[in-house]
Curated annotation (Swiss-Prot):
GO terms for molecular function: G protein-coupled receptor activity; odorant binding; olfactory receptor activity. Residues 1-28, 78-97, 165-193, 261-271 are extracellular. This is Olfactory receptor 5H2. Glycans are attached at residue 5. It comes from Homo sapiens.
């Protein structure tokens, strides 16, 4: 039998966002500021919800969970990217790569389920206000949250296990700023067809399920809103739904474009820009979107500031 002299790679190079040295320090500073604001704002929102009994309702229970997931995703991707802006050696080991991918896939999938859960919560609040406390009880809220995190964990675990069937023996250059799944497939020596198929089936099914849940929830909510005769009631309902609809649009927009865009070198660059948006920018925007136009959150923050001044 012929001896197989193929050397399997256990380290990779992340190309990052730019090859131009003059851009590295400005980008480092920009993303460092974004990361710090993201962490402070999301953790601050969690602390605010935790400490104010008036915010201990399902809407803010899920919002606090979303803030945690946003901080998780940002912390999974951004620190390594910041290090690579300054480091001459942008290597990442296979084990580190797998940990980063699992952590990101877990957070991203959990966020999809949380957005769908929050849409259902708004549907019940608008369409069945009298039954809201009965339907959205503590038991259901905990089960919905557990389902979201368990779904994220299992989805990430399945892809993680399937990645270990791949071998890497030619190029060790990952054209991305973090270990995402598709760039890993592109440098695999093993045929990744099964992996691509599972991404299409599992990730596609999750996105379709969560998007349909959001659309159905807000379609019924919209019809209920339009039946309201009170202008104040209509404004309040739209205000309640507006922040979540904006967050959903920002999150799913780049993902949908990535799936629909044909493969090309230009598409790879655009995919990286889209990845920056939903891994770094959206975790920054979500707490701002949900906080700035939310009277209860603003009032709670104001009371907290007055207590501590």
């Amino acid at each position: 039998m012929e001896q197989d002299n193929t050397t399997l790679l256990t380290e990779f190079v992340l190309t990052g966002l730019t090859y131009q040295p003059e851009w590295k320090m400005p980008l480092f500073l920009v993303f460092l500021v974004i990361y710090l604001i993201t962490i402070v704002w999301n953790l601050g929102l969690i602390a605010l919800i935790w400490n104010d009994p008036q915010l201990h309702i399902p809407m803010y229970f899920f919002l606090g969970s979303l803030a945690f997931v946003d901080a998780w995703i940002s912390s999974t991707v951004t620190p390594k990217m910041l290090v690579n802006f300054l480091a001459k050696n942008r290597m990442i080991s296979l084990s580190e790569c797998m940990i980063q991918f699992f952590s990101f896939a877990f957070g991203g999938t959990t966020e999809c389920f949380l957005l769908a859960t929050m849409a259902y919560d708004r549907y019940v609040a608008i369409c069945k206000p009298l039954l809201y406390p009965v339907i959205m009880n503590n038991s259901l809220c905990i089960r919905l949250l557990a389902f979201s995190f368990l779904g994220g964990f299992l989805h990430a675990l399945i892809h993680e296990v399937l990645i270990f069937r791949l071998t890497f023996c030619n190029s060790n250059i990952i054209h991305h700023f973090y270990c995402d799944i598709i760039p890993l497939f592109m440098i695999s020596c093993t045929d990744p067809s099964i992996n691509f198929l599972m991404v299409f089936i599992l990730s596609g099914s999750i996105q379709v399920f969560t998007i349909v849940t959001v659309l159905n929830s807000y379609t019924f909510a919209l019809f209920t809103i339009l039946k309201k005769k009170s202008v104040r009631g209509v404004r309040k309902a739209f205000s309640t739904c507006g922040a979540h609809l904006l967050s959903v649009s920002l999150y799913y927009g780049p993902l949908i474009f990535m799936y629909l865009r044909p493969a090309s070198p230009q598409a790879d660059d655009q995919d990286m820009i889209d990845s920056v948006f939903y891994t770094i920018i959206i975790p920054l925007l979500n707490p701002i979107i949900y906080s700035l136009r939310n009277k209860q959150v603003i009032d709670s923050f104001t009371k907290m500031v007055k207590r501590n001044v």
